[in-house]
Swiss-Prot record:
It comes from Candida albicans (strain SC5314 / ATCC MYA-2876). One of its GO terms (cellular component) is plasma membrane. It is found in: Endoplasmic reticulum membrane; Microsome. Pathway: Terpene metabolism; lanosterol biosynthesis; lanosterol from farnesyl diphosphate: step 1/3. It catalyses: 2 (2E,6E)-farnesyl diphosphate + NADPH + H(+) = squalene + 2 diphosphate + NADP(+); 2 (2E,6E)-farnesyl diphosphate + NADH + H(+) = squalene + 2 diphosphate + NAD(+). PANTHER family: FARNESYL-DIPHOSPHATE FARNESYLTRANSFERASE, SQUALENE SYNTHASE. This is Squalene synthase ERG9. GO terms for biological process: ergosterol biosynthetic process; farnesyl diphosphate metabolic process; isoprenoid biosynthetic process via mevalonate.
């Protein structure tokens, strides 16, 4: 009831919920051969592990849909081994380091997880995943195997790192490296898939996948900031000591010591972590501008707009220190609908960067740095899509630069998607208007 009342108090979000579930048409509806039992089961496993990821994966272009699904399940299997504290290190570490070799087999399974491990079924039925994996194009198999090797060894290294296990993340450099292994490598693998399928520009692979890495780091850092309290309850934390030690001697004190001074210190720490995460935004916008397939674009864009909205929510927010802070469900629906084109994504980023800037307090130690960073990002958004009304009257066209070339190269793609969006809006508005007129007519009939 509370969520329904919340929606009623935000009518734009209420309309977004109705439009998303009633009128939005996926670009590529997920159609599968019901007789292909292994493939059907793999998608069932995908839904069991993550319904949100399953929803966006199932709408991908058929060329990449199965490859991305298998990529996700393989990494989920790897993560399930790494997370399970009931598996002895003598078994876990060799298994992580050699997990990529299991992809050479066709019937390998693993039943060594604890009975309460949430995603143990993925490993128990790994032979079904292998069956579909071996049907993928060899190039797609190689990409999945390569990332599995890198991630498995990265996980094993962290398990053996006593300093990390005892004291957590030490420096900002360590923070970046940890996020790279957890999320940046996923971006690298997906980028290789996009480029190989001709869905993304080849320049996405330049500079050792720097832009793809930023995409992953931006998401992971946002989650790490948001999950402070939850991670603390699990006896761990990923906030880098190099940052939090400026504000407290013990990281737990932000939650335990309930004084105005400690709360201010905790919020200041959150804000510096947000500042650090914002350093990846321009790379993320660059990356998205170079993804040309509409379904792949949405697949990449949705998590990014959720992340920037979440950053705006956690910024300068003491609630992060004592519980979970999330964006509203209605906001989520609105962001999904509005992030299907590059202009839509740029508009969303600009909106939430302005929210962050307006929430800033002059008392914050990083007030000026945050203001400068937000200004830089807003300016970057303006460079991609300038406000033509603000241009001098004498300037009839924009001078050519990298942004005008990128926008021009994808204009037909975004316009095609925009037409679909406008049709959805029209259909939704007509139905809502009709329902509203019917309700008013009934009220009039009853009263008069």
């Amino acid at each position: 009831m509370g969520k329904f009342l919340q929606l009623l108090s935000h009518p734009i979000e209420l309309k977004a919920v109705i439009q998303l579930f009633g009128f939005r048409q996926p670009l590529h509806p997920g159609k599968r051969d019901v007789n292909d039992k292994e493939l059907v089961r793999c998608y069932e496993l995908l839904n069991l592990t993550s319904r949100s990821f399953a929803a966006v994966i199932e709408e991908l272009h058929p060329e990449l849909r199965d490859a991305v699904m298998i990529f996700y399940l393989v990494l989920r299997a790897l993560d399930t081994i790494e997370d399970d504290m009931t598996i002895k290190s003598s078994i876990k570490i060799p298994l992580l380091r050699e997990f990529d070799t299991k992809l050479n087999t066709k019937n390998w399974t693993f039943d060594g997880n604890g009975p309460n491990e949430k995603d143990r079924t993925v490993l128990v039925e790994f032979d079904k995943i292998l069956n579909v994996y071996h049907r993928l194009k060899p190039q797609y198999q190689d990409i999945i195997k390569s990332i599995t090797f890198k991630m498995g060894n990265g996980m094993a290294d962290y398990i053996l790192d006593e300093e990390f296990n005892v004291n957590g993340v030490a420096t900002v450099e360590d923070y970046n490296l940890y996020c790279h292994y957890v999320a940046g490598l996923v971006g690298e693998g997906l980028t290789n898939l996009f480029v190989l399928a001709n869905f993304g520009d080849k320049t996405l692979t330049e500079n050792n996948f720097a832009k793809a890495d930023s995409m992953g780091l931006f998401l992971q850092k946002t989650n790490i900031i948001r999950d402070y309290h939850e991670d603390l309850q699990d006896g761990r934390s990923f906030w880098p000591r190099e940052i939090w030690s400026k504000y407290t001697e013990n990281l737990q004190d932000f939650h335990k010591v309930k004084t105005p001074a400690k709360e201010f210190a905790g919020v200041s720490c959150i804000n510096e972590l947000v500042l650090n995460a914002l350093g990846h935004v321009t790379d993320c916008l660059d990356y998205l501008s170079l993804v040309k397939d509409p379904s792949s674009f949405s697949f990449c864009a949705i998590p990014q707009v959720m992340a920037v909205a979440t950053l705006a929510e956690v910024y300068n927010n003491p609630k992060v220190l004592h519980g979970v802070v999330k964006i509203r469900k209605g906001t989520t629906c609105r962001l999904i609908l509005e992030s299907r084109t590059l202009p839509g994504v740029v508009k969303i980023f600009k909106e939430y960067i302005q929210v962050i800037n307006h929430k800033s307090s002059v008392r914050d130690p990083n007030y000026l740095k945050i203001g400068i960073k937000c200004g830089e990002i807003e300016q970057y958004c303006e460079m991609i899509y300038p406000n033509k009304q603000a241009l001098p009257p004498s300037m009839k066209s924009l001078p050519e630069n990298k942004f005008t070339k990128i926008v021009a190269s994808r204009e037909s793609i975004d316009l095609s998607v925009q037409r679909r969006i406008e049709q959805e809006n029209f259909n939704c508005n007509v139905v809502l208007f009709g329902i509203g007129a019917l309700i008013l007519s009934l009220i009039y009939f009853v009263l008069y």
